[in-house]
Curated annotation (Swiss-Prot):
One Gene Ontology cellular component: plasma membrane
Root EC class: transferase
Catalytic activity: heme b + (2E,6E)-farnesyl diphosphate + H2O = Fe(II)-heme o + diphosphate
Additional information: Carbon 2 of the heme B porphyrin ring is defined according to the Fischer nomenclature.
Name under which the protein is recorded: Protoheme IX farnesyltransferase
Membrane topology: Multi-pass membrane protein
Species, as recorded: Xanthomonas campestris pv. campestris (strain ATCC 33913 / DSM 3586 / NCPPB 528 / LMG 568 / P 25)
Keyword annotations: Cell inner membrane, Cell membrane, Heme biosynthesis, Membrane, Transferase, Transmembrane, Transmembrane helix
Transmembrane segments: 16-36, 45-65, 97-117, 141-161, 172-192, 223-243, 244-264, 277-297
InterPro entries: Protohaem_IX_farnesylTrfase, UbiA_prenyltransferase, UbiA_prenylTrfase_CS, UbiA_sf
Gene Ontology process terms (BP): heme biosynthetic process; heme O biosynthetic process
Amino acid sequence: MAVSARDYWDLTKPKVVALIVFTALVGMFLAIPGMPTWLQVRTGALGFLGIWLAASAAAAINQLLDAKIDAQMARTSWRPLVVGKVRPAQVLAFASVLIVISMTILVVWVNVITAVLTFASLIGYAVIYTVYLKRATSQNIVIGGLAGATPPMLGWAAVTGLPTSADWINASLLVLIIFIWTPPHFWALAIFRRADYAKAAIPMLPVTHGVPHTRKQILVYTVLLAIVTLLPVAVGMSGVFYLGGAVVLNAVFLWYAWRMLDPPDELFSMKMFGYSVVYLMALFAFLMVDHLLLPWVR
C-alpha cells in the first residue's frame, strides 16, 4: 500500500510542531529592535523553515522509537507507523531527509550557531528524552523538557547569531518560561492518561507517585511559572501590554492548578491541559504584540 502525504504529515505531529515554531517566530521578533530589515526577514523565514523541518524530523523519530509504546496507548494507537500505514524504514528515511534539508538551510543561509542549537535540541528530544529519560525517571518531562523549550532561542539565534550576553540572557528567559510551563502542561494530560502510561510501563509522575502528589506538583510549577513570566518585564524586554496579558493568563492558570487539588470530575485535568496550550500561545502572542505594535505603552 502506497504511503499518502497525509501519513507523512501525521508523522510530524503538526499540532505540536505548530506551537513549537510559533514560539520560535516570537523569539525572532523579540530579537530585533523595531521593524526588521529585508535581510532579517529573509534570514528569519529561512530560519523558520529550518527549525520547522528539524522539529518535524524529531517528531517522526520519536514515533519511530516509541512505536511499541504508542501501540499500547489509546491516545497514540492511531499513528501511521502503529497501524501499518508506513514502515520503519520509510519513517527513518523521511526523518533523515528532513534533517539534511534543515541543516543545509540553517548552515548555508542562516548561521552555524542556529544549526548547532537546533541539532542539539533534536537529539535532546528524539534520542535522549525518547530513548532514555522517558523510560528511566518520573522526572522525564522535567529534564527532557529543556529540548522542547529551546525554540525561542533558536528563533532568536536565527536573526541575530546571539552575538552578545544580553541576547543569550533574553533568549534564555523565553526558554525558561516554556521549561517551567512544560511539567504542569504535560502532567495534566498524564493524570487523565495514567492508565495508558502504567500499561506501557512509562514512569510518569502520576504512575510512580500517585495523582494527589502530581496535583501538588502541578500547583508548585504553576506558581513558579507565574513568577517566571514576569521576568521579561523585569529586564525591560516587555512592557505593560504584555504584563497585563500575563497577569490575566496566570490568574486563570493558577485557578486551574488550585482547582486540580480537588477537581470536580475526571475530565478536569484535560480541561487544564487544553487551557495550558491556549495559555502558552496567548502569552507569546502578548510578547510579540507588545514588542511590535504597542511600544508607546511601555
